[in-house]
From Swiss-Prot:
Stretches for region Mn 6: 346-360
Ranges for region Mn 4: 278-292
Gene that specifies this protein: Saxo2
Record region (Mn 3): 244-256
Protein name as it appears in the record: Stabilizer of axonemal microtubules 2
Region (Mn 1): 110-122
Chain positions covered by the region annotation Mn 2: 144-158
GO MF annotation, one: microtubule binding
Protein's organism: Mus musculus
Region (Mn 5): 312-324
Family named by the database record: Belongs to the FAM154 family.
GO CC, any one term: nucleus
């Protein structure tokens, strides 16, 4: 007989107790074992590639033509004018002059790659690509499909044409009375009062003052001139400069020969005709004479005011006061619609509502009805056995 826990019998969820969560075993992956044998590093690209001889590109860029300017160029910068050079004597080199002679014997030390590498013959892979030869059929092409063979044409029936209805306007007037207007009965109430204050026009005959609160609070003050920092006079150091460095003192000469340059010989193009330093840009755009541009100053369009400031603006001088006319209210009167018929407050919900009986949770009893207590486990769950009703014998 199956035993039922109190958590399973309860319908409200108040007697639920959590069960112990069993942790699932973790899958341990197998140890990786590398495959035996050697890897064939030959590819189809290395097998089928045919190298081509590459020729150097010919430069399309034209020869640079320098512009020769007439007149003497002042090449003395401000650094040379301000810089004071020292009287430095040239030091003689302590390194002896030696010519480098490369060895004639071949370098005999081999690398680890040359010792361990064993060249292998590349075997061509078997091609599984089908043959590209097209097999031509001898007989004529049969263009009949299963749809063409099995299709049976049927005769279409005549389509029924519905006659168009003629619109006939009604003679009765349009009723614009809605259910809301018919059933709604407004409540009588007081009209809302206007909280806006009455408009009072302020007229002043006093002359306008040009001063503001900001001008009164923040008066101009005198700004002191900036301080000029005095530069100390340059004093040259006394004595001679020691030009001996750690490299000159600790240098040990070695017997070595000079390295021969591996740079290839440059092949320059030799032309017999004289160089023409002219271009279309130089001919069309000759050099302009540099002159200082004058100061661009716009003419003053508004004349300076003359006389004392009146404090009257254009808005005040051209302003014409008008009498305020109140706006006519188009709001309808707040009158309640009265009806002699009483309000029908019956709804579909009140007609079709069926009250349900409140059920009592069986777990709220000390012993649930229809169950017999069996035992309690280590976690505190109570188990009950269901009572089977007795069957009467015939």
């Amino acid at each position: 007989m199956r035993n039922w826990c109190l958590c399973q019998i309860c319908t409200c969820g108040s007697d639920y107790r959590p069960y112990e969560i069993v942790k699932q075993p973790r899958h341990i992956p197998e140890e990786y074992k590398p495959k035996q044998g050697k890897i064939d590093l030959g590819t189809t690209y290395k097998r089928d590639f045919n190298p081509y001889k590459v020729q150097p590109l010919i430069k399309v860029r034209p020869v640079e033509r320098q512009q020769v300017k007439k007149g003497k160029l002042d090449t003395v910068p401000t650094y040379k004018d301000d810089y004071r050079s020292w009287d430095i004597q040239k030091c003689e080199l302590c390194k002896p002059e030696q010519a480098y002679h490369p060895p004639d014997v071949k370098f005999g030390n081999s690398t680890t790659f040359q010792d361990d590498y064993v060249p292998q013959e590349i075997k061509p892979r078997q091609s599984f690509k089908p043959c590209s030869v097209v097999k031509c059929s001898v007989g004529p092409f049969n263009g009949d499909t299963s749809h063409r063979r099995d299709y049976v044409p049927h005769q279409l029936e005549v389509k029924f044409a519905r006659p168009k209805e003629i619109y006939k306007p009604t003679d009765q007037p349009f009723e614009d009375l809605t259910t809301h207007r018919n059933d709604f009965q407004g409540l009588a109430g007081e009209t809302a009062k206007i909280c806006r204050p009455a408009y009072t026009r302020v007229t002043q005959n006093i002359q306008f003052k040009g001063s503001t609160e900001f001008r009164d609070s923040f008066q101009p003050w005198e700004i002191p001139p900036p301080k000029v920092k005095k530069v100390a006079e340059y004093v040259p150091p006394s004595g001679s400069m020691q030009l001996n460095s750690t490299s000159h003192l600790d240098y040990v000469p070695y017997q070595a020969s000079r390295v021969v340059a591996i740079r290839p010989v440059s092949h320059r193009r030799q032309s017999n005709f004289p160089f023409q330093g002219k271009s279309t840009t130089k001919e069309d755009f000759p050099a302009w004479e540099i002159c200082r541009q004058g100061l661009i100053k716009q003419q003053q369009q508004i004349p300076n005011p003359s006389g004392k400031f009146e404090g009257l603006s254009t808005f005040r001088s051209h302003f014409v006061p008008h009498e305020l006319i109140p706006t006519e209210s188009c709001k309808p009167l707040n009158e309640a619609l009265k009806s002699s018929v009483p309000l029908d407050d019956v709804t579909m919900y009140s007609i079709q509502f069926t009250p349900k009986k409140q059920e009592i949770c069986p777990a709220s009893y000390p012993s649930p009805p229809g169950y017999i207590f069996e035992n309690t486990n280590s976690q505190g769950h109570k188990f009950f056995r269901k009572i089977i009703p007795a069957v009467k014998a015939f």
